Amino acid sequence: MNLLSLKEKLLDFGKPIGLQVDEETSKALTLHAGIVAKKYFPKSIYLRIVIFSSGTLHMFFTFYEIESTYDNLFLINDFNAESPWFKAYIAHINDKDFLELHYSAMGLLEDQEILTSISYMLNSLIEEETLKYLNPILNNE
């Protein structure tokens, strides 16, 4: 996989959400963006995408602060049991707790496979089935 050509395609693809390069090496490319989807989420979401030249893709969606309570942990477990794509967890960042969703895929050796996966996951984030289990965690009911 040629990360340089992929980078240009990703930046063009990601213009609507302000996707920017965070870091690049010969083996990996990291991009990030702040996503605003007020129709679905009251606050912006931080998106980080990491692509390895081996064909592995990771997407991290970091939401706003949440409390690390038993109720939220049970809701996160429900989400994880129902979500075929994302895995949710509480990420401890700078002494604060945030809800984070993670998606990963391996064996994506063509640029188009990466672009299709990213597009699909961005759309999956706002699908009714995802929101059904995500909104209670975020108190967006």
What are these regions (language model features)?
Residues 54-98, 141:
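Short, internal acidic amphipathic alpha-helical interface segments
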Residues 13, 76-83, 121-132:
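Conserved short hydrophobic interaction patches
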Residues 1-44:
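Charge-rich, low-complexity N-terminal segments
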Residues 35-64:
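Long, continuous compositionally biased terminal/linker segments
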Residues 88-120, 124-127, 131, 135-141:
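Well-ordered alpha/beta subsegment
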Residues 28-30, 44-46, 58, 85, ...:
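Broad gene-expression machinery/nucleic-acid interaction feature
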Residues 17-23, 49-51, 88-92:
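Short, exposed beta-strand/loop patches in secreted or surface proteins that constitute
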Residues 3-7, 69, 115:
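Generic alpha-helical secondary structure
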